[in-house]
Regions:
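Short beta-strand-to-coil loop within P-loop NTPase ATPase cores
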Residues: 36
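His/Asp/Glu-rich metal-coordinating catalytic cores
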Residues: 2-30, 39-146
């Protein structure tokens, strides 16, 4: 099994996946490829080359930043697996806002989950948070963490 730090690790631009050559919710500057957890501005920014996200998140980003917020977009439904440079990525509901997603990254037998913002309490405005089974590493958003 791959060491977790070889699949995802923090950089000044955000959480980076070297084998897939993409960022999760990049925090500084534009990147060539981004996977976005949800449409709030602390996670979703314009100017990236390629953006992969849930269709509702892409719609929120377009409303906020204009239709040209990225050079290319790819909408992915919950549970739909996409391969990026040999790394499997799929989204699971995060229960935070419409389109909010946990980002699941799998490579060489390792499954890591990045939650983005999430909410476990039921909310009628979005699909409920779903735990991702058989997760090896769980990276939780902690807005008010210590």
């Amino acid at each position: 099994m791959l060491r977790p730090d070889l699949l995802l690790h923090p950089t000044p631009k955000g959480l980076y996946c070297p084998p897939g050559d993409f960022y999760l919710d990049p925090v500084r500057g534009a990147v060539d490829r981004a996977v976005i957890s949800h449409g709030h501005s602390d996670h979703a920014r314009g100017g990236h080359g390629k953006v992969l996200a849930h269709p509702h998140t892409l719609s929120i980003m377009a409303a906020r930043y204009g239709d040209s917020f990225a050079k290319q977009t790819q909408a992915v439904e919950y549970g739909e697996a996409i391969e990026i440079n040999g790394v499997t990525v799929w989204l699971s509901p995060a229960g935070h806002i419409l389109g909010s997603s946990q980002i699941v990254v799998e490579h060489k037998g390792l499954r890591m989950v990045f939650t983005g913002d999430y909410k476990r309490r039921w909310d009628p405005t979005c699909p409920q948070f779903e735990p991702v089974e058989n997760t090896h590493v769980f990276i939780s958003e902690a807005t008010f963490g210590l």
